[in-house]
Amino acid sequence: AIHCAALALMKLDNFQFQYIFKDKSDYDTYMENYQATYTEKADDIRAGGYRIYTTLDQDLQTALQSQLDNVLSPYTELQDNGKYALQGAGVIVDNMTNSVVAVVGGRGTEDVYNRAYLSARQPGSTIKPLIDYAPAFDTGEYYPARLVNDHKWENGPSNSGGSYYGNVSVREALNRSLNTVAWQILTDIGVDYGLNYLGEMEFQKLTYIDNGVPSLSIGGFTNGVRVVD
């Protein structure tokens, strides 16, 4: 709660959040400013005098926790500290208000480490609609019925199972989650063009090292992404 409240205070003070960085110098300068401002706001909250309101829906929160527990129930291996070896996280967002209405950061023992917004993992093919296809459609050059050629790329990715289908529609390429087509599309529209879409959606683990890297098309990021992103 303190973390989110500190960010809210930063927004109220017109702090300019940044998600895309030109280079290391740009990133370092921003992070120095961010950390100083964040620490100041978090300390203000801990000093008292604030009333914090959340958008969490307790019924949805309970349902999400139950669903996570049920899905992972077959995996019972425990670590030495008594926590489950296999963990998970989940978030529900109200798309009308963009508010987080439920957030689950794990299962089992009580844990202050909330994996839903603190832990980053590689998104794999789940990122394709966001960084490849949606930006490509917005260019007007790509549309669901357009044909693209699915073939093996030198120094590029292969498809799951090693199969290639030749000329396929963009719709079919997305349906089959073809890595080669996703790579081709992002390379064609420009990696940084697609990356900027994630910046506009406020993905918070992006780094300057990701700039121009075509493996982003199939979910290969430097830091990964968070569930809440």
Protein language model annotation of sequence segments:
Residues 1-160, 171-172, 218-225:
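Extended, non-catalytic substrate-recognition/exosite surfaces adjacent to catalytic cores, especially
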Residues 141-195, 213:
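Conserved catalytic neighborhood of penicillin-recognizing serine enzymes
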Residues 205-229:
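Active-site-proximal helix/loop microenvironment
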Residues 118, 178-179, 203:
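A broad detector of the eukaryotic-type serine/threonine protein kinase catalytic domain
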Residues 42-46, 174-177, 207-211:
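Short, flexible turn/loop "capping" segments at secondary-structure junctions
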Residues 190-206:
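Short, charged, amphipathic alpha-helices and their helix-cap/turn boundaries
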Residues 130-133, 183, 195, 228:
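Predominant activation on well-ordered alpha-helical scaffold segments within soluble catalytic domains
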